[in-house]
C-alpha cells in the first residue's frame, strides 16, 4: 500500500489554489507532487480545491504505478467525508471530486486517515509547504473535472 500525505493552499491576492502531495511507497521511496490553478470554480472554494486535487493526484499516481491500495492522509475532513457520503457534496466541484474518487475506488482500494494540521507531523508539514510553494508556479493550471484532472 502507498501512503500519501495531501494538503491544499490558497492565496487570495493572486487568486490561486494549490496542492501538495508526499507519496511514500512500501520500499521506502518518497515522491512529491504539487500543482496550482486559478479556475474560477476552484478559486471559489479556496484551499479546498487544492485538498481535493492532492487526493486525486495521489490516487492517480498509485494507479499509474500499479499499486493495489492507497491511504490518503489529510488534515481537511472533506477529503474523506465527501467520498464516503458522510458529508453531502454541495458544490459542483465537491460533487465532481466525490464522483471521481468513488469511481477510482472501483479500480484501487482507497482508505483515509485524518492527521492533525500544523502539529509537527513531518510529511503533513511537507505537503503543506509543497502546496504553498506551488501557489507561485503558473506554468500549469490544475482544475477538477468529472472523469479526470485537467492540466491546461
PLM regions and their residue ranges:
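RNase H-like nuclease fold core
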Residues: 1-49, 60-61
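RNase H catalytic domain
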Residues: 9-15, 56-126, 130, 135, ...
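Loop-to-helix element that buttresses phosphate recognition and phosphoryl-transfer chemistry
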Residues: 50-54
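A cross-taxonomic marker for long C-terminal extensions/tails that follow the last structured domain
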Residues: 150-152
Amino acid at each position: 500500500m502507498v501512503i500519501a500525505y495531501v494538503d491544499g493552499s490558497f492565496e487570495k491576492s493572486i487568486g490561486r489554489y494549490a496542492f501538495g502531495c508526499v507519496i511514500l511507497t512500501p520500499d521506502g521511496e518518497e515522491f512529491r507532487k504539487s500543482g496550482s490553478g486559478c479556475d474560477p470554480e476552484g478559486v471559489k472554494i479556496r484551499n479546498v480545491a487544492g485538498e481535493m486535487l492532492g487526493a486525486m493526484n495521489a490516487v492517480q499516481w498509485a494507479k499509474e504505478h500499479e499499486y493495489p491500495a492507497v491511504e490518503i492522509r489529510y488534515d481537511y475532513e472533506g477529503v474523506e467525508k465527501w467520498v464516503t457520503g458522510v458529508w453531502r457534496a454541495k458544490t459542483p466541484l465537491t460533487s465532481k471530486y466525490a464522483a471521481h474518487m468513488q469511481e477510482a475506488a472501483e479500480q484501487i482500494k482507497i482508505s483515509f486517515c485524518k492527521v492533525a494540521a500544523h502539529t509537527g507531523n513531518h510529511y503533513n508539514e511537507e505537503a503543506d509547504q509543497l502546496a504553498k510553494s506551488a501557489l507561485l508556479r503558473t506554468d500549469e493550471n490544475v482544475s477538477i473535472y468529472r472523469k479526470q484532472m485537467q492540466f491546461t
